[in-house]
Amino acid sequence: MLFRSAAAAGPVHAVRVDSQAKYALVARGDADAYLRLSPDAAYAECVWDHAAGALVASEAGCTVTDAHGVPLDFGAGRRLFGARGIVCAPPRLHARLVDALRPLLG
């Protein structure tokens, strides 16, 4: 979770939040973004860990994709095979995050 700092140019604060509350925090505007990246490129997230939260964030106007900017496919099975990481953020920030992640993902 990336929480807003008191000063606009202040430090980024990473905070651990359990369950799908992380999506709700971004949807409410209490957090700037939610990024989830596994060091293992072959790892596939479980659908049930993200589907409801992604829906809440999307309905609030956020963009939720994998780290390459590809929409998540929750209807393709129990796991998000082919999706590398997760990025949830308001549209004004989402594209910038995906662009920043490209060099890291290869």
Predicted segment positions?
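An extended, acidic
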Residues: M1-G106
